Swiss-Prot record:
Monomer. It is found in: Cytoplasm. Keywords: Cytoplasm, Endonuclease, Hydrolase, Magnesium, Metal-binding, Nuclease. Belongs to the RNase H family. It catalyses: Endonucleolytic cleavage to 5'-phosphomonoester. GO terms for molecular function: magnesium ion binding; nucleic acid binding; RNA-DNA hybrid ribonuclease activity. GO terms for cellular component: cytoplasm. This is Ribonuclease H. It is an enzyme of class 3 (hydrolase). It comes from Orientia tsutsugamushi (strain Boryong).
Length: 168
């Protein structure tokens, strides 16, 4: 793994593109991260056999920030308005209200939002929303990675289902 060591004062930002994908929502899903810094690239993806698209979008963002071992200036690009609005508009109010919505309900995916909030404290993050499937190269790479994760999750879920049928 490449070490992306640099100071947060460095003017060259780490560029991160994230995406999540889910089949049947909830169902098998995947997340993808495309990271570039100077002349280095990193592509990572993962999966979950029972999840939602929003959880995969958040997981992609969390896993991307976990890749950074030091404090960075980060430009983070997502095609998820849920992530974009949540982190730039809603999260401060959620924290003030003890992670409850205005209806006194616990924020959906609170576990992931809390983790994401903790991770961003280490970095200087600029959040950018990009339209999905609009030709943005970084987003297209992240989308393909998320789809790979989703396909793996679908295969695992199918094998588990077949195993259950076999054992019954």
């Amino acid at each position: 793994m490449t070490n992306y060591a640099c100071s947060i004062t460095n003017n060259i930002p780490v560029k991160i593109y994230t995406d999540g994908a889910c089949s049947h929502n909830p169902g098998p899903g995947g997340w993808g991260v495309y990271l570039s810094y100077k002349n280095h690239e990193k592509k990572v993806y993962g999966s979950n056999i029972n999840t939602t698209n929003n959880r995969m979008e958040l997981t992609a963002t969390i896993e991307a920030l976990r890749l950074l071992k030091h404090s960075y200036k980060v430009e983070l690009y997502t095609d998820s308005q849920y992530v974009q609005m949540g982190i730039t508009k809603w999260i401060k109010k959620w924290i003030k209200n003890n992670w409850e919505t205005s209806n006194k309900q616990l924020v959906c995916n609170v576990d992931l939002w809390q983790l994401l909030y903790t991770l961003i404290q280490k970095h200087q993050v600029s959040w950018h929303w990009v339209r999905g499937h609009s030709g943005n190269i970084g987003n297209e790479i992240a989308d393909k990675l998320a789809t790979n994760g989703k396909i793996e999750a679908m295969k695992i879920a199918k094998n588990n289902e077949n195993t259950k049928k076999f054992l019954d």
